[in-house]
Amino acid sequence: MNPSPSVTELQVENVTFTPSVQPPGSTKSHFLGGAGERGLEIEGKFVKFTAIGVYLEDDAVPLLAGKWKGKTAEELTESVEFFRDVVTGPFEKFMKVTMILPLTGAQYSEKVAENCIAIWKFFGIYTDAEAKAIEKFTEVFKDEIFPPGSSILFTQSPGSLTISFSKDGSIPKDGVAVIESNLLSEAVLESMIGKNGVSPAAKKSLAERLSALLNVTSDKMK
């Protein structure tokens, strides 16, 4: 096990993302890789809906370093392959999505489901198994309401996605549902930071912070 990388907290609007967490359903420590808002242009104005924090298991840095150390933040930001390696890498990830504006569970899950299906169709891997996983995913959210400050939490483990909810910023120990689907688990994160990810700000933040951490790792290995 590698020591936790030394990182700072991040603020997105009035949401604070702590430097490290132990996600629901995991026994491992995760550090804050990056964070940013998700918003849409509405009538000429950028409206922010959620703040997204992406955490990575501590082992992620040495696992990514072999291929990506020495790259600048700009190079990582522009690299589709880098973000695919983050999404598909053999380490846990944790995503905390905190509401800036209120959303219903149906509004949130339907948009995520739509993005996941688009990703699978792009890769040519949308089958009945994925359709069933999406059904389970939307079912978990159907009766939920998320006021500002409440959070949706995703723990991405190899082969499964643990979903949790928090109304007060705390991190629960266990999830409300576990969906056994590696492709769904990866697609949820891909929809945030992938090629057409919904949060360019979180992607940029992740690239900047990981570039610095990977270069520290590179210096230590010299």
Swiss-Prot record:
Residues binding substrate: 50, 115, 191
Reaction catalyzed: a chalcone = a flavanone
Domain of life: Eukaryota
GO molecular function, one term: chalcone isomerase activity
Swiss-Prot/TrEMBL GO biological process terms: flavonoid biosynthetic process
Tissue expr: Expressed in leaves, flowers and fruits.
Pfam families, sorted: Chalcone
Further comment found in the protein's record: Part of the biosynthetic pathway for all classes of flavonoids, a large class of secondary plant metabolites, many of which are brightly colored.
Protein name in the entry: Chalcone--flavanone isomerase
